[in-house]
Amino acid sequence: MSAAAQTTLLEVVNSVAQSVGHPKTTDVSSSQDESILRIAYYANIAGTELSYAANWQWLTKVSEIQIVADFPAQTEKAFDLPTDFHAFIDDTQWNRSTQLPAIGPINSQDWQWLIVRKTMITTRMMWRIRNKKLWIKSPPVNSQPFSFEYLSKNWAVDGNTETPQDLMSKNIDYHLYPWQLMVLYTRAKWFENEGYDSSGAYEDFKRAFMYETGVDKAATALTLVPGQGYPYIDAVKNIPDTGYGFGG
């Protein structure tokens, strides 16, 4: 098959079927052929696994959560993450109101240290993920936007409604990956799960994967000059919330 911007479930299944010597199908979802249905299953497993194999630019989204306390001096508060949230992109969390980066993720030990000592953090947003929620330490009484980038779990699209989703079920549903990644990974899974030697198929996939992750987005230039990161040993405990050496 030729490379296409949108490769459907039917195209992926038929490409894999043809490559392993199995007859193609005209309809995946209503097929009575167990081999075709298994290839479709392998394709969805491959798509899901690829979603967390790299920080794909086509799965990267920007979001904003309004952070506000329920009452003054609230110790911590949980906020809902986007429904398609899969994982944060590191170091993209900012408070748009103060134009300062948020500090996190705070580990469990430091979070409990802050809670037990009843430390009220008002100069910076501190955050962690717990029970699939975003938790903010000492949320402000006035709403402030917590901005971030994240990876979406929705690697596929409904072919009828164009709605993003996390699987392909209809013939015309399509995925967002380069076509060869899905075909080669699905093919490798076919060899593995059908009891054949899958080493060659996985080598084909790995070469394609290395290429695609290399060209997916521009790389950061490396330098030996000291960076612009924070020079603090521990940004949670080393910085007082008030005082700053002025007798406070």
Predicted regions and their residues:
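Glycine-enriched, solvent-exposed interface loops adjoining structured elements
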Residues: M1-G248
